[in-house]
Amino acid sequence: DPAFRLPTTTRPRHYQAAIPDFSAGA
């Protein structure tokens, strides 16, 4: 999924909410 490659600031909120480890790590 391309969204996983985007910075946390541009990634959709639902991705950040569903995957906090990606949000914090990226």
UniProtKB/Swiss-Prot annotation:
Necessary cofactors: Zn(2+)
EC number: 3.4.11.-
Domain of life where this protein originates: Eukaryota
Top EC category: hydrolase
Record's keyword terms, sorted: Aminopeptidase, Hydrolase, Metalloprotease, Protease, Zinc
Annotated cofactor note: Binds 1 zinc ion per subunit.
Organ and tissue specificity: Midgut brush-border membrane.
GO BP, sorted A to Z: proteolysis
Record GO terms (molecular function): aminopeptidase activity; metallopeptidase activity
Described purpose of this protein according to its UniProt entry: Binds to the B.thuringiensis toxin, CryIA(A).
Family: Belongs to the peptidase M1 family.
Protein name, as recorded: Membrane alanyl aminopeptidase
Species of the source: Bombyx mori
